[in-house]
Design a protein with these regions (language model features):
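A short, active-site helix/loop in glycosyltransferases that binds the activated sugar's phosphate group
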Residues: 140-170, 175, 179
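Conserved acidic donor-binding segment of nucleotide-sugar-dependent glycosyltransferases
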Residues: 308, 312-319, 328-333
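A conserved mid-protein helix/loop that constitutes part of the nucleotide-sugar donor-binding site
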Residues: 17-25, 194, 198-220, 227, ...
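Aromatic "clamp/platform" in nucleotide-sugar-dependent glycosyltransferases that forms part
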Residues: 257, 276
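Acidic anion/phosphate-binding donor-loop and adjacent secondary structure
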Residues: 127, 155, 172-192
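Short His-centered aromatic/hydrophobic patch
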Residues: 92-99, 118
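Short hydrophobic beta-strand element within catalytic cores of glycosyltransferases
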Residues: 41, 293-296
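N-terminal strand-loop element at the rim of the active site
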Residues: 9-73, 162-164
């Protein structure tokens, strides 16, 4: 039997963003638990929403107060904890965790390998994240791209040491298709109503104010259609202000962030995403696995999703045209059911979580040789 690998997973927040939720799913997978001893390091103590979810499946959970006046003390404590852990692998997820975490390489054994997962298109990062990431990439022993588009952008911005990568690999995001499976679709009556939904962290790139604009157009054309936006985040106030300006207060249900996203997907029939950029959105794959039909902006890693005949990808944001595509499903229910089935089949075929987990474990073992 192979020796278990001891891994420190480092991330800035541990709430309900795609990368965080994906980690939660990793830790619950039998293959991962059988081969990996996982410790979690969260740099911002204010956002620990998934802590209780992962505790049964990991070894230790650490968190720090880097957003307080104690920043320097907390950062030193973090570096000491990484050193004491004597890890085989330190796996960092998203910026901040990447450029703060890799400093620990100065204090740990050469046998410890440092891996960074890039979940987004770096050219859309804030200036400080962009430059700090670019200057520290060369210290990682391997960089994982979660989509082909993510890797293409990195290659375009590389210049000398800037975004220099060692052992880059593309490992596509995957989901647990057994967990995200809804069997109630054929009970729907699309001719009467559908529910348009979103499950996301309301970050600026999600452009949730545009989501509200589409909802307003759909509501004018088909008042019976319902709307559900599950999430919270920095753009929450912007969203609510736009809803008020559009005079659709009370039209969109806003329950905040839910721990059980599967329950949300069961209620959603059409998954609407109006982002400016994406790596490979986990929530989209989860929604499609549940049979939700995607209506999404054709940006970033979404471009690589070759699912002709399923939903609608838009290159230009035109709320009225997008609304027409959505309303058309109420006029042709049979087409909705066909595309719902195709959505799930597509994810099962190409984006299995088991495949992703095994590829990451293989990478760990390869680097340890």
């Amino acid at each position: 039997m192979a020796i278990k690998i001891k891994v420190a997973h480092v991330i800035r927040v541990f709430s309900y963003g795609g990368a965080e939720v994906l980690l939660r799913e990793f830790f619950a997978q039998p293959e991962f638990k059988a081969q990996i001893i996982s410790d979690v390091f969260v740099l911002d103590h204010k956002k620990l929403g998934l802590k209780d979810d992962v505790t049964p499946n990991i070894n230790k959970f650490y968190y720090y107060k880097i957003t307080t006046w104690r920043f320097l003390f907390e950062y030193i404590k973090f570096l000491r904890d990484i050193k004491k852990g004597n890890y085989d692998v330190v796996h960092m997820h998203l910026p901040v965790a990447g450029w703060m975490g890799v400093v620990a390489k100065l204090f740990t054994s050469k046998k410890t390998k440092y891996i960074y997962s890039e979940h987004n298109l770096v050219n859309f990062y804030s200036k400080y994240n962009y430059y700090l990431s670019g200057w520290t990439y060369g210290f990682f022993d391997s960089v994982i791209y979660v989509s082909h588009e993510v890797g293409e952008v990195i290659r375009k911005v590389q210049k000398g040491w800037f975004f220099k990568t060692h052992h880059p690999v593309t490992i596509l995001n995957g989901i647990d298709t057994n967990k995200f499976h809804c069997t109630h679709r054929y009970e729907l009556k699309p001719a009467e109503t559908l529910t348009i939904g979103l499950v996301a962290r309301f970050r600026p790139q999600k452009r949730v104010e545009r989501w509200a604009e589409v909802a307003a157009e759909v509501h004018k054309k088909k008042p019976n259609i319902k709307f559900l936006m599950v999430g919270d985040g920095p753009s929450d106030d912007l969203l609510r202000q736009r809803i008020k300006e559009l005079n659709i207060e009370g039209v969109i249900e806003l329950p905040g962030m839910l721990t059980d996203t599967y329950t949300a997907y069961k209620r959603i029939d059409i998954f609407l995403l109006t982002s400016d950029f994406e790596g490979l959105p986990l929530a989209l794959l989860e929604a499609m696995s549940c049979g939700c039909v995607p209506v999404i902006s054709n940006v970033g890693g979404i471009k690589q999703l070759d699912f002709g005949g399923i939903g609608y990808k838009f290159d230009d944001f035109n709320p009225s045209e997008i609304a027409d595509k959505i309303v058309a499903y109420t006029q042709n229910p049979d087409q909705y059911f066909i595309e719902s089935d195709r959505s799930r089949d597509f994810v099962i075929k190409y984006y299995s979580l088991t495949k992703q987990v095994n590829e990451i474990i293989d990478l760990y073992r390869e680097l340890m040789k």
